[in-house]
Amino acid sequence: MPKKDNNIEFVALDSLEYEVFEFGKYLRSVRQAKGISIRQLAKDVNKTPTYLSDIENGHNKPPEKELLETIIQKLNLDDSPKVKATLFDLAAKERNDIPADVKDYIMSNQTLLRIIRTAKDRPNSEQIWSQIAKTI
């Protein structure tokens, strides 16, 4: 249950399920959960409130890596790796790209690329990836 403080509604960041979110809506939820106004965040990242509002409302694409990292820093998400990863994942999904926080690693790792290409054509590859994730 969200709590209120000075008429601002907060939700626990861990309770945000990103599967039901678009990037902008998720960003807005995180920003509001942190109690930061759109004007303050815009000032902190050197953008206009209108620009950020357009992102939150789905009128602009998610920001590129550098700006997204700045937003994450200004939202003080260092203690929320799941939320950070979700922001990168949703931004990448809407851009039809690889998440920016892992792109360089994936592209520089030939073994990983070979494994991904092999797995994508295999039946039950989701189960294989789940087992790999458990091992790691």
Regions found by a protein language model. Name each.
Residues 31, 42, 72:
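The alpha-helix within a helix-turn-helix
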Residues 65-86:
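DNA major-groove recognition helix of helix-turn-helix/homeodomain DNA-binding modules
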Residues 57:
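Short, conserved catalytic or interaction motifs in soluble domains
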